Amino acid sequence: MAVANDYIVKDIGLADYGRKEISIAETEMPGLMSTRAEYGASQPLKGAKIAGSLHMTIQTAVLIETLKALGADIRWVSCNIYSTQDHAAAAIAAAGIPVFAVKGETLTEYWDYTSKLFDWHDGGMPNMILDDGGDATMFVHLGLRAENGDTAFLDKPESEEEEVFFALLKKKLAEKPKGWFAGLADSIKGVSEETTTGVHRLYNLAKEGKLLFPAINVNDSVTKSKFDNLYGCKESLVDGIRRGTDVMMAGKVAMVAGFGDVGKGSAASLRNAGCRVLVSEIDPICALQAAMEGYEVVTMEDAAPRADIFVTATGNKDIITIEHMRAMKDRAIVCNIGHFDNEIQVAGLKNLKWQNIKPQVDEIEFADGHRIILLSEGRLVNLGNATGHPSFVMSASFTNQTLAQIELWTNPGKYERQVYTLPKALDEKVAALHLEKIGVKLSKLRPDQAAYIGVSQTGPFKPEHYRY
């Protein structure tokens, strides 16, 4: 591991390898490259100090360097202990951008690295957060809560992750002067949030009146949720399962828990690989969608003894329980493509016999002798066992992130302590930036046609409530 004053990466010698892959990714990320060309001269992010917590991949490296090209100062960590691509982290460190990310870092290291986002190299503090999952945001919120005297929760962790996180907060409270977290909260002008789980956290904070700064929900931009969540998972899920297990997918029975955008992409991914796909759902609308797509909609109890492959994609907890896993076939494959690891009751497996097969692949034996194969310890399988979504689809997501950062930074008085989404015009702009790359020719409305349907010739073409 290479440790320097302002970076921690696996091996700084991987920087050249990372730089070559970044160069290739740039060709596949027209939205970000167009954003550099459009905004580079005006430097809209000059003065912004962005604390970034998002999977440290090759695609994220292109995002980081786009933010830098627009004037931002940046510190970065990965938002998952297994999702870092070490050559990407090395390339960013070699470019002089502080990054703290190692594939396979411990939970203690993860939270220590996250805390480094807020200890700025010039002795100051960040003034913006770019988040994925909400951990950086929660560091500020829970730190301030404890600093203000409400510390009882620190002694009541509900998971191993919370135990480590709360221990870090106690350490920071002891190290930092009184008022440090209050100053940090005041310094932050806004956060842009990448994923469903983090967005849920933001809406809960806003509902309780506890959100400390304005937030933009990037996840619910159409060019994020209907592309990254759907088409990204459609390609990356099976990639992760295959790299982890080398299993023949065709003919297998696969179970997908959840039929939101991620579940839809996951089910399609498995079907395209030749699997017979089962789906579980709590929402009657999503259940009906799954059934009309030709999937068999069942409960997890029905699927447990039937399926060969299990994928959770719900954003909820305890979707696959110990009892479900006890009922599974020998060497059934169990994995998750939701943000957190609590969709599968991994903690309840800790007292069983574990055999590590290779990095992020474990075989767990139950008392009766039957085994399951668990991928990435229940964390994101597509990033833990593979390299995540392709560059092109991530360009759309990350262009939204860049525009959200520009919007929050350049219009500080426009937003209250609430959760916002980007306007439809920007959503359409992000989509338009990606058309030429794949040879799309867009039709144009004539003035009379635009008037007939009541829209501008240049858009937006749909009302805010339109469901794509």
UniProtKB/Swiss-Prot annotation:
Localization annotation: Cytoplasm
Metabolic or biological pathway: Amino-acid biosynthesis; L-homocysteine biosynthesis; L-homocysteine from S-adenosyl-L-homocysteine: step 1/1
InterPro entries reported in the protein's UniProt record: Adenosylhomocyst_ase-like_sf (IPR042172), Adenosylhomocysteinase-like (IPR000043), Ado_hCys_hydrolase_NAD-bd (IPR015878), NAD(P)-bd_dom_sf (IPR036291), S-Ado-L-homoCys_hydrolase_CS (IPR020082)
EC numbers for this chain: 3.13.2.1
SMART domains in alphabetical order: AdoHcyase, AdoHcyase_NAD
The keyword Cytoplasm is assigned to this record: yes
Cofactor entry: NAD(+)
Catalytic activity: S-adenosyl-L-homocysteine + H2O = L-homocysteine + adenosine
GO-annotated cellular components: cytosol
GO molecular function, one term: adenosylhomocysteinase activity
Record flagged with keyword NAD: yes
GO biological process terms, semicolon-separated: L-homocysteine biosynthetic process; one-carbon metabolic process; S-adenosylmethionine cycle
Keyword line: Cytoplasm, Hydrolase, NAD, One-carbon metabolism
Pfam annotation, one family: AdoHcyase
Main localization, broad class: cytoplasm
NCBIfam families: ahcY (TIGR00936), PRK05476.2-3 (NF004005)
Function: May play a key role in the regulation of the intracellular concentration of adenosylhomocysteine.
Protein name per Swiss-Prot or TrEMBL: Adenosylhomocysteinase
